[in-house]
Amino acid sequence: MRRLALLIVCAVMPFLAQAGETVPNTLDEAFAALDQLLPPEDRHAFKMATEEKAITRGHMAIGLYIRNEWFRSGKSKLSGKLREAGARSLDDASSMVLTSYWRHLNSKPINLKEQGECYTKWWTEQQRLEKEARAKGENGYGTPTFSCP
């Protein structure tokens, strides 16, 4: 697992220094960019993993690249579109891109609205747990018992 993440990070690093890099503004553009960024063997490994494993493994590798280079740079309109769909954080947004990419590679319905609704539900539950813990005078609180997607 860690080897795949490391391979993906190493494969992507040369692209970080490219000047004038075009960032995607749509999911289709993101898919095309990921097709270019990921070597065929990494793309194949991502596709062949289960959806959950692919997203988990990719989160701190290609997901980190997506967050830093596409979203934090402010150059891409895609993060705003994902926020409109329900992403509440850049982690949510990059996970939605990775989930959508995995589904695209595997010819599955992307269901972006459903993905966004899950994140909205997750954050609502997180806020409820925080409020409940504060009301009890507790310093800590749990996280929702489900993950997205």
Which positions does each model-derived feature cover?
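Compact alpha-helical subdomains of small soluble proteins
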Residues: A45, A49-F146
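N-terminal secretory signal peptides
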Residues: A19-R57
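Hydrophobic h-region of N-terminal signal peptides that target proteins for export
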Residues: C10-Q18
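Positively charged n-region of N-terminal signal peptides that target proteins for export
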Residues: M1-L4
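Small-side-chain structural scaffolding
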Residues: A17-A19, A30, G63, S94
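Sec-dependent signal peptide cleavage junction
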Residues: G20-P24, D28, E138-P149
